[in-house]
Amino acid sequence: NDPNGLIYIDGIWHLYYQHNPNDVVWGPMHWGHAVSKDLIHWEHQPIALYPDELGFIFSGSAVYDTQNSSEYGTNENPPIIAIYTSHHKDGLEQQSIAYSNDKGRHFEKSYLNPVIKNPGISDFRDPKAFWNPVRRCWSLVLAAQDRVFFYASQDMKNWEKTGEFGPEGNHVKGVWECPDLFPIEYKGKNVWVLVVSMTKASEDDHCKMQYFLGDFDGEKFLCTCPSDEPRWLDEGFDNYAAVTFQNAKDVLLMGWGMNWQYAAQTPTEEYCGQATLARKLSLTEVDGVLTLAAAPAGLEKFRHSSYPIENHTTIRTETFGLKISGKGDAKICLKNSVGQKLKIYVSDTKITVDRTMAGYKEFSEHFMTEKYSISTAARKKDGAWNLELVFDVSILELFAEDGVDAISTVVYPETPYDRVSWKGDLSVELYEIDA
């Protein structure tokens, strides 16, 4: 499930992730590992971290210690330091580290573990480490029940708590998970973005990701753009635990394309769950409100080969993208040979994805309900609009207005979608992805 330790080193993107090698459902968690040169084509690698006497290997992050502050490498060959949650069978959660001297292929655990001991609470997990430009040291943010804690260290081994944030924003009682904190430049200044994943989100009662905009004073996050309503990173059902890549030029984020409500019941055999596309994050103003946008990354070479299509065009691949521009109300439909349909509705006030008739759904009582079949992103858009739809076997990722709105939805069609049709004044281009 959760992406872990996302990092870019020497032209290679590393995706570690929560992995149970013994079953297709959650269990004794390891860190799986995959690598890519382009964020689209991934190759599985040997398991990176195995459970030990401290417990399962839960979520965490990785940094490139270029100055060898940890002294686990050399100046000529700096180490990658992974920091993760050790989850003991009795529920105790503490933070541990491991280091790699071969660019992330293999890791050795520190004899100092745990480097952050539990302060006496449950749900104390998911450290996301980053360079602190204010104190010029390492910092991390981790989830602590319904809030996040901040820690600082000079060497990744000895940590001091520096602050807290939350609960704020979405006031539903639930646990925060998989936090991330990072700056994005906007009009010549850095705006700090805090992302938290929530096990239970407001009226929807499903997991979702919320973000806050503000500042980081070197010790804690300060929300400078409060909102009466939660600000969601994705309005769909199936994007959770997303975090950013370290050591990358752009701010790129990747999530788990699934929902805890039905993750253990999905009707798949060769895989269970998937990562989302990497998304390039930026800030933009929407109706005078500073807003986080997330546009798909890594698709440039495929978009260059896109071509216009007519209504009711046949699609000959299970992985493809659609670039759509239009104005006014519209309906877009992906169909297969047995009559199953994934429908997208667009208007000036909202975008709706309806998977009610999209495929096999009897595997879960949650997946079948209307509450888990129709996802909507509210918006205000007059005149022309644009969408990009990316479909990969069993997941749709929709991006509106270059990522201002996003909806991620998994579906399980009995046969591949092989036709696209629409109603409305639209211009549609198709590109195929050889993933």
Predicted regions, residues:
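Catalytic nucleophile-His microenvironment captured as a short glycine-rich beta-strand/loop
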Residues: F182
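Repeated scaffold domains used in trafficking and secretory/extracellular systems
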Residues: G60, W176-P179, Y240-A242
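Beta-rich accessory regions
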Residues: K187, L213-A435
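Beta-rich carbohydrate-recognition and catalytic domains
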Residues: N1-P127, W131-G174, E185-E235, G257-Y307, ...
